[in-house]
UniProtKB/Swiss-Prot annotation:
This is NKG2-D type II integral membrane protein. The lineage of its organism: Eukaryota, Metazoa, Chordata, Craniata, Vertebrata. The gene is KLRK1. One of its GO terms (molecular function) is MHC class I protein binding. InterPro entries: C-type_lectin-like, C-type_lectin-like/link_sf, CTDL_fold, NKG2D, NKR-like_CTLD. Homodimer; disulfide-linked. Heterohexamer composed of two subunits of KLRK1 and four subunits of HCST/DAP10. Interacts (via transmembrane domain) with HCST/DAP10 (via transmembrane domain); the interaction is required for KLRK1 NK cell surface and induces NK cell-mediated cytotoxicity. Can form disulfide-bonded heterodimer with CD94. Interacts with CEACAM1; recruits PTPN6 that dephosphorylates VAV1.
Amino acid sequence: MGWIRGRRPRHNLEMSEFHNYKLGLAKSDFSTRCQKQRCPVIKSKCRENASPLFFCCFIAVAMGIRFIIMVTIWSAVFLNSLFNQEVQIPLTESYCGPCPKNWICYKNNCYQFFNESKNWYESQASCMSQNASLLKVYSKEDQDLLKLVKSYHWMGLVHIPTNGSWQWEDGSILSPNLLTIIEMQKGDCALYASSFKGYIENCSIPNTYICMQRTV
């Protein structure tokens, strides 16, 4: 009996330690399972939080690209309008007499720039119907406004095949120091462009034109 009593406390101690050990393992296993179960949840939440951020970044980039495109378009439109704007005439020039309504009065001459396209003969007839003629260049000083012209317009200059000269509608010969004639196409008529240049063109091709009326 003494031996049995002596062993029971030891047995109880071992059982208690074994029970505590199993309890510790159970807690550790439970903690591990909890951590494993929580990780997908946390990752899912991270993805959910990342989605709005990614969407916001995508929207910001798209808006930035759109802004750059719009600025490029606006710049192109502005530059196009700048280089193709109508002739700006100084208002301080001396009085040059009466001109038809809406015509430009400049240094004893009246000018009108017509945007409708006609061939050379139709353009000439249109000017004559308004008691004017197609543009004649006779002086770089008195007609310095012609430096501002940006596009091509019919003027009253034609080629005479018999002698190879260029003449104005009134029969006068072109002075070589007034215009630089450039052969753009085969033809017997000439278009005026900027900086006192004339471009050879087929007379039957429609173009805009300039009418001119002398006041003196």
